[in-house]
Amino acid sequence: MLPVIDARDREAVHREAEALRRWHDGLTEPLKVAMVYGGGSQEDRLYLAHCPPEQRSDTTLRRSLTEIGADFTVLDPCDPGFVRSLPAFDIALPNLHGPYGEDGRLQGLLDYLRIPFCGSGVAASAVCADKLLCKRFMRSVGVPTPDWQVWWPGQKTEWPGRPVMAKPVLGGSSVGMSLVQDVAALVPALEYAWACDPSHVLVEEYVVGLPVTVGVLQLPSGLLVFPPLATEAIGAEFYDAEAKVDTNGRGAVSVTAADLPAAVRTDLIRHALALWNGLGCGGWARIDFVITGTGQPYALEVNTTPGMSAESNFAVGAGLAGLSHADVVRAILHEALTRRPYDVPLPTPALGAAAEVGETAA
């Protein structure tokens, strides 16, 4: 396991940022970065439809990549030439969410093509994107998570007698998710979730408390756990898709440093690190919790491709820890490029030919 850097030690954080700048300044040529971004999932299409360009994560990432002098190109995974374009780049920076973006499928493609990429690998991405698998893993390592049931289409449903969250098993940004507080709302909530993921629905006990999120960033000398953030939707029942994705309503969302007792903060960091290490996350991640009135944290989800707009939870947490947006970008590029290098050739002649095309284009 990697050492942990205390976010309260500003000198240590500053040293890490300086080490990243020296590493990047020592590169002989600008990095050729493929930022993978587009509307491949319902979540991303919703984001593109509702978020003004100036507030989107790709705009902020473009700004930071320009600041650090990277030679970057935005590649749309829906473009027919997407796969053939990839070998021309030194590294891929996925900026996608939901199925085909952060669920291990894109990561598997990049891994197969021997293209370094930012963020977690295939296994961690796949498990974290599947809420059911992730909750089972949480339980297996002793991290508290709300009780749940799994319901399939056509299954007889019974009101559990207490409020629950109905969630699609795959996908994020609360798309397809509903708070169900009475029996009349149960069937519409299930149908809404099934419309997003027709396989099965996670019906999770609704835990009343303070929503908190914790960012984790892999730096050259270890893991930095950001100060916990309290994330509350004002005037809404919960932090729903509209609050997360529709930035025109950002005034209805409160994101602040969480004022927590030392013992609760310690528990949060311990649980976040247990999930990071146990799942084998890499680069960066954001773990969402809810804290009850008695100070008990319950883990909800692990996000392996956090949103990176200027006002995103991850960027705000990094700022509280003393890092700029450009520092975070350097960190995830550094982590991806300093992993164990590939030492075997491309596995098929077809992929070898694709690599040659990329080399010629370069």
Language-model segments: which ranges?
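Phosphate-binding site of ATP-dependent enzymes
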Residues: V183-R270, I291-Y298
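Active-site nucleotide/adenylate-binding loops and adjacent lid/helix of ATP-dependent enzymes
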Residues: M1-Y37, F72, P87, V127-L210, ...
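ATP-binding N-terminal substructure of ATP-dependent carboxylate-amine bond-forming enzymes
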Residues: M1-C118, V122-A123, V127-A129, L133, ...
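A glycine- and small-aliphatic-rich helix-loop capping segment at beta-alpha/alpha-beta transitions
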Residues: G108-F117, D182-V187, L320-A321
